Amino acid sequence: MASDYYQVEILHYLNPNLIWVEVLNSPNEISFEQLGVYGILPIDASLDVERPGLKLQRSEDWMPATAILMKNIFQNLEQVWFSPTHIDRRSSIFDNNIHKYGELIIKKNGVQLYLSKELVKAGLATEDPCQFHQYMSLGKIKTKLSNTETRAVIKNLEEYYRKSSKPKELWQKSVHQNTSIFHAGERLQALTVKNLERHNNRQNIMLLENKLKDLEQCKGSDEVSLGRGVCRVPSNKSEMVMLTNKRLKNRLELLSKINMKSDATDAVKSTKRNFSGDGQRKNFENDFESDDESVKKVSIANTINTSDGSANVVDKLLDEKQIDNVFNNKKQICYTESTRRNPVKKAACIVYGPPSINIDKLPLKEAPKMTKTVKWTPHVDCDKEASEVSFGDVDSHVKLDVKNLDKFHEIADRIEIEKTIPVDVNIHKDLYDSMINNKNESESKIMETANLKTEMKNLRKSSILQSKLKQFDKFNVSSNSAASESSTKSSMDSSRISDEDDLSSDDEMSEIMETFKLNLATPKKSEAKHTIDHIEVNNTKLNANPFKNLDGSKSVFVDKLTSPVLLVHTKRNNKVQPCSLLRDVPFGTSIHVVLRNMGIKHPTRLQTVSWGTILRGLSTFLISPPRSGKTMGYLPAVCRLVRDFRKESPDSCGPKCIIVCATSKSVSEVERISKMLLGLEDKVFACYSGMDNLSVTTALLNGCDLLICTPKSIVRLLQNDLSVDLRDLTTFVVDDCERISDVYSNEVKYVLYEIKNMLKNRVNKELKVQIVVASRIWCDFLEPIVLKAPDSVVCIGAFQELILYSKISTTVDFLRPENKIANVLQFIDSVQGPKRTVVVCRADNEVKAVESSLRYNNRVVFACDNTMNIHDLYNLNVVWGDFEDPTLGPILVCCDSNLVHLNVTDASYLIHYSLPALFSTFCKRFSVLNDNYPSIFKNESRDLKVKVLMDESNVEQLPKILNFLKRCTENVPKILDEVSEKILNEKDLAKVKDLVPLCDNLLSLGICPDTWNCTERHRIFKECDSPADWIPKNGVVTFQILYFHSAVMYSARLLSNTVDGETTKYPQTYSTLSLKMGMYFSKESSRRLHGIPMVGDVCAVSKKQNFFIRCQVVKIISFYKNGNPNYVVIKLIDEEKFEQSRDIYLYHLPDEFKDMKTYVVQVRLANIQPQDKDITFSCLAKNELEKIVEKNEDLFMRGHVAMSVGSCIFVDTLEACLDLSSLSETVVRHNFKQELLNAHAVPNPKHLSILEEMCEKSGLIVKAVTNEQVVPKPIPVLPAAQWAHLEDDLSSVYLASVEDMDKLFVRLVKFESCMKLLNIEINKYVSENTVPLDGSNVGDIVLAKFPDDSMYERARIDHIYSEDKVKCFFVDQGDWRDVSTNDLATITENFITQLPFQAIECRLIGIRPFGEQWTEFSTNWFSDHCFEDAKGNLKHLYVKHFTKEKADCTGGHKYGVALIDTYTNEDIIVNQLLIDLNLAKENVDEIAYLSEIKCNKTVLNNDATVDEEEGSLSGVSEPESNINVPLDKVFLKAPIRSVPLVDSEYETSDSDTWQINRPEDFKALFMRTRPESSKIIPMITANEVQNNADGETSKDTSTILEEKGQLPEKVKDDELKLSKPKICWSQNKNTVKLKILIAGIEDYKLKIEDRAVAFSANHCDVEYGFKLELYGVVDVNKSRHSNKGQYVLVTMTKLMCRNWLALTKEGDSQKWIVYDVDTIEASSDEEVYRDDTLEVIKNIHNTNNGSDSEDDDFLDDVS
C-alpha cells in the first residue's frame, strides 16, 4: 500500500458516510475514527411513468440496500485500509470532532475491492466530487446524529468489543475517553430533568399543604361572600356549617355540572362576571361557603345578588390534579358551546381562503363550533401606580448581548423596592412558575369562527343583557363626561397653537430680527410688524389610512398582508389616494428617465402619498425614519412644479422654490440631484457658507428657478440690498427639520415672516405658498406651521412619533419577569368598554403564558403564534374584524411576525409585553393604533394608551428607549441613566473588538449630533486607543499630505518632529518596503492567497499591476453560501485609506513585512468648526486647500501638536511651507487654518477640552496623547456593468471589430443614436473635470481616449505596461488600444448605468478553419467585405444567434451567429459564402443551423426610397413572390410598452429594459439597408486590406483563390485607400458647419454640390479624402469655406430651415465624423440642443412615416 494508507478495523457502520473504525497502530491503546467514503452521493430508483423501467435520481438518503451491500462486502474480509482525502470538523461523535472522508480498500479472498467503486457499480451511488463538496457545504450530507442515535452507536461499539478478545479495561477506558463530552452532556441533561421534576413536586406539595390549611380555617369561618368595600361582619357559631370531605366531593360534582347549563345561563354567567358590582371575586382563602343551600343556589344560577348587594361568586373546589392542570396549562381554556335540547344538526363544512379563490380546489374542513367554558379566577386588586413615559425613537444598529446582567438584577431590585405594588404575589408567582416549567408542553390553539358572532347576537337578544346594556349606557355617559373634563384639561396644558402664541408675533419677531442684526454684518432694512392670520380647522373625521383595497378581484385578506400602513391626516378632510406605480405619477418624461437611471423603479411607502399631494399643490409634512426616501419623496415633485411655473412666467428672475437644508453637505447633494432632474433648462443655484457674495449676487440677478441653501444663508440673502425676490415663490421646503428645529428655528420663522409679508402684497391672493417639510421626528416646532400652512397634509411613517404627535398616554415599567403577567392583568382590568387591545410578545411561550392568564381571568382572547399557517391567520383575521360586543373588548396576543401579516390598525390599547431584537420592529408595533390616533387638526381627545414592560433581559434596548422617554416626559428615574450608561459603555467595548473606529464627528467637533443613528464608537478606551510610541505627542510636526478626506482631516506621512529644539526625523521606509514587497511578489510562487479573511487580519492586496501594498481587514460586508467572507473592507496601512476588496484578491503577507513602520497617520485640524453652526465642511473648502497643494508639489505641511488619540494627531496650527535650500530657510506660503477661518470656519475652543475630558475618564494622560483609529470615507463602489445582448430573432448590427471568425464583436444599430448622445456627455464631462485618474487596477472601468478619433469613451483596463501606459478594451467598440495614463479619466456611476456596454462578442456558427487557426487572408477578406459598403459607410448587417455561451472578453455572452448581408439582390449568409469561397470548411456539428436559416430566409423588397428632406423611410411593400414567412411570423407580437414576464435563463432583468424595438422597426430597418440593384459581390483578390481599426494595412502573400462559381466583377473605389480626417460638424436651423481637422494644411481641394461635399488633400505625405452625401439639400451659392490654420471651416446654407438628424444620408456611423460638442449650448430662442436631443430619441425607434406604432404616441408625449 502507498504511504498515505493505514490499516483499520471496522467496528460499526450505518451508511457509506458513517463508518466507525479502530486504527490498528498500537496494541496497547485503542484509537477510534469516524470515516466516510469521499466523493460519492446516494441515488434512488423510482418508477418512470413515461418510459418502462426504473429512473435513477440523486437523493439525500441512502437506500436500505446500501447497508445490505456493505454487510456483504465486510463479511469474511482479510484487511481494510483507508486513505484520507478530506477532513470535516462538524459532525463526529468523538471528542476530537474529526470526520475523515477518503477511500476504503477491502482485501477479500486475495482481491482488492474499493468500496466507492462497488457502490457505484451496484447502482446505489454516483461519483461526483464537486457536487459532494457542494452538498457538504450546504449541510445536505446527513452525518449529524441525534442523542439517541449517538447513544446507540456507542452501545454497538461496546457490544463489538465485548465479543472481542481485547481487555475490557482497555476498551472501556478508550471508549469513555473518546466520548467524554457526549456523556457529560447526557449527565447534565439528566440532572436538569431531575431538578425540574423535583421542583414540580415541591411546588405541588406546597400548594396542597396550603390548600389543606385553608380548608381547616374554613371550619371556623363565619364569613359571607364579600365585595370590594364591604366590611367583614362576624357571625354566630351556631350559623356556621362545617364542611367535610364528603361535602367537598358533592360540591365538586355540582361544579362539574355547571357547564351543562343552557345558553341563557351562560349569558347570565357572562354578564354577572363583568357587571356585578365592582367585579368582586374571592381569593382561594375564601373559596367556600358555610352551608349546602348556598352551594345549590350557586349550582343553579351560578351567581346571585345577596340582599346586601354583594355578589356571591362560584368558588373553584379543585383537587390536587385539577389545580395542577390549571396552573400547568394542560387543560385548554376556551369557549365551548353549551349542550342544547334541540336535535343535533349536521356539521357544516367550510373552506379557508381568500374570497376570490376556487373552492373546488381546496379541501373542505368541518366548521368548528363555538365552545365557551366559563372559568372563574381570583381577582387581584392592585393599586395602580405607573409613570407616564414614552418609548421608541430609532433602530439599533448594533446587536450585542449584555453579559453583566447580574449588575442589572440589583438595579431591578432597587426599582421594585421603590415601586411597590400591593398585589397578591402568591397566585401570580405560582402561575408564572408553573407556566415557565411547562413552557415546552404543547397547547391547543384557539378556534374562533363565525359561531362566535352568532352567539353574540343571541346574547344581545336576551333580556338579561338588555338590562345590562342600560347600565352600560349610564356608565358610558359618565365616562364621556369624565373624558370631556380630562380633554378640556389636557387641551389647556397642551401646546396647541393659538393666536396668542403666534409664530410670528411682534415681540418674538423683534427679538429674532435684533439677533440677526447683531450676528449678520450686511445692512438690513426695517421691516413692518405683522401677524399671520389664524387658520380655522374643520372639525371633521379625517382619513387615517389611505391604503384601501380598490381592486375587486383581489382578496381583502391578501390586501391586508401586502398593503403598507401609513398615517395621513388632512386639514380639508379630502381623500388621499396613494399611487403605487411610478409610471402613474405625472412627472414628465425627462424626470422619469432620470429616476430610472437612478435605479428608482417603485415609490417607497412614503412616496406613494407625498408625490401626489405635492403635485396637487398641498402643503405636505413628511415624518419618516432615516433612509426611508424623504428627500426623494419631495424633490422630483418639486422639480416638476418648478418647471411648470417657469413655463408660465419665463421672464421672472426670482426663485420659484426655495429648499432649506441643515448642512452644506445636504445642500450639495440636493443640488446634484436637482440638476439631474431639471437638466439644463432650469437654473439651479446652491448657496452655503464660504461662497463669494459677488458671485452669489450675480447668479441671483441672472435668474434662479430653484434655490437651495442653508438657514443662515437664506437669512443673509433676504437681508441684502439685492435680496432674493420672493414675488414668484410658490414652494418653500424645509429638509432635515429634526436638526433645524433645534438649531435654526429662528431662521425658519424669519423666512416664514418674510413670506407672509410678500403674500400680503401679492396681487393674486389665491396663489399661496406651498410648504413642504421633511423630518425624522415630530417636533413641537412643526405644530404651529402645520396648522397655519394652506391645505396641510401630515404623512407619518415613523409610527413611534405618533405618540408625540397625538400626545398619547404612555407608561413604562421596569420590573421582574415573574411580575409581568400581574402587571398586564392590572392594565386590562382598567380597560372599560368594547375597546380593542393588542399584546405583542417576542416568543411563542410568552404568547401561551399571556393567553392562558387572560383566559383564566375570563377575557375574550385571540392568540396568534409563529406556528399558525395561512388558514389560521385568515380565520383569526375574519373573527377579529367581525367581533362586536358592546360590553367586552377583544384582546389580541401575538408575535411581531404575525402582527405584520395581520396588519391590525384598529386597536385602542397597546401592551409591549417584551421588546424585540430590533428597535425598528418595536416602532412598527405602534401602527396598531393607526385608525384611532387623533388628528392635530381637531381638538379631540381619545382614550388611547400604550404600556411598555421592561425587565433585565431587555436592557440592551434601554438607551434608545430612555432617549425617547426624555423627549416625552421629565419624570424619568435617574437610576435608568446609570443603567443606560453601562449598556452604552459595554456596546462600545464590543465595537472595539470589531475594529469600529471612533466617530468622525466626535473627533472633528467634539460632539456627535446624531448619536442614536451613528454606528461608530463614541467612547475612548485606554487599552485600544493609546497611541504608538513613535506618534508625536507634542512639539512641532512636519508631514506630507497623501489624501484629503475633508477640509480638516488628512492622511499624512510624517517627516519630522521637533520638541524643545530637538528634531527627530522619521526614516522614509515606505520606498524600501515597497521595493521588498515588489521583489517578493514578483515570484509567482509567492503569490499565495490569504485564505479566509477575519477582522483584524493583516495581508497584502494588489493596488496596481504587480504593485502590492499592506492592508488590514476591518469589516466583512458579505458572505458566500458556505459562510465564508466574500467582500470585505480593508484599511490600507501605508495610506490610511479604506477600500473594498474580495477575499480572492488578498494575498498572504510574511511576518517580516507586517511589523515594518511607514509612519503614516491621520492629521486633524483642531479647535475650528464650520460656519453657521454647520456640522460638515463644504466641498468648496476642501477643493480650495487641494488646489494649493497641487500647484506646488514641493510644499510640505507643518503644525503644532495639541494632542494625539490613537493614530490621529490633532494640530492647532497648520501651515504650508516651502524649503529654500539655497538660503537654508523655510518660508510659509499658506496658513491653512487662517484660510478656513477667513471664509469657511469659526473657532471652536471647546473641541480639544471635550476630547481631553473623555481621555481622562478612560485613564489616559491628557497631555500625553490619546488613541483612536479614524476611518476615512471609503472609496465609492461603482455599480455592476450591464452588457448588451442579441434578441431571439434577427438583430440589426454593425460590425465593430474582428479578431477572426471565432471572435468578433458587433453592436446594435438601435442604440447608435443613444451612443452618440452618451459620447457627447462623456466628452463634456471630461472637459469640465480635468483631474486625471489617480491610480488604476486591472479590471477597472474608466474613461479613455480612443486613439482613432481622440474622443473619450468607456473602457476597461486589461493590462498595465507601466505607470505611463496601459492596454484598454473599449467596451462599446469591442477593440483593444494602448492608451497613455494621462488620457484616462474616472467614470461616474451614471455613465455606467445610462446605457449597457455595446460590444457583443460573437462567432460565426457552422464553419471552422482548415487548419488549427484562421489564416490572415480569410480574416482580412471577412473584415474588408463586412465592415463598410462601397461608399465607406458601415454596413447594416443582420445576425441570428443559435448558441449562447460564456464570453471570453466581455461580461455578457458569446453568441454563435449566422451573419446575413442584405446589400445584394438576394440576402447572403456570410457563413455559407466563406464555405463556398473555400475560405472555411463546414463544422459538421453546427452546419444544420445554416440550413435552417436557408429554409426560413425571407426575401425583402429591392426598392427602398429615401425621403430627401425628412431622412426617414417610406412605406415598405412586400414583393409578390419569394416570400416564405410573413413578417408577423418572424417576430412575435409584443404588447404596448411590454416588459418580459419571465427573465431569460442567461440574461439579467436589467438588460431587458433596452429591448425597445418592435417588428415594425425591424421591417423598416430591412428596407433602409437595401442596397441598389447594381451592387454585386466583389471578387476575392490579394490586394491590400485593412487589418485593424488603426487603419494599418498589410499585404497578404497568399495566392488568389480559385472561384467555385461565376463571381461578379469588383467595383473599384479609390476612396477606400484614402485616409479620413476627423470632421466636427454643427448646425442650427439655417446653416451647417464642418470643421475638417487637419492642422497646418496649406493646399486642399473642396467641392460643394447640392447634396454632397467632396474633399481631397495631401499633407505630410498622407493622402486625405472623402465624399459625403448630405442629409439635406444646401444652397451652393451661399456656401463657403476657409482655411483657419488648425482646421478647414466649411459653412453651408440649408434650403429648408430645419434641423438634420445626421450629417449624412446614411447617418453618422463613421467614427471620424462627430458632432461639435462646443456648440451645443444654443440661444434660448432656438433651443437647438433640446430639439436635437428629442430627434435623437425619436431616431432610436427608426419607425417609418406610415407606422401606427404605439411608440409614436410615446414620442408625442416626449415632444
From Swiss-Prot:
Residues 823-980 form the Helicase C-terminal domain. It is a peripheral membrane protein. One of its GO terms (biological process) is germ-line stem cell division. Residues 74-153, 1335-1394 form the Tudor domain. SMART domains: DEXDc (SM00487), TUDOR (SM00333). Residues 611-789 form the Helicase ATP-binding domain. PANTHER family: ATP-DEPENDENT RNA HELICASE TDRD12-RELATED. This is Putative ATP-dependent RNA helicase TDRD12. It comes from Bombyx mori (Silk moth). The lineage of its organism: Eukaryota, Metazoa, Ecdysozoa, Arthropoda, Hexapoda.
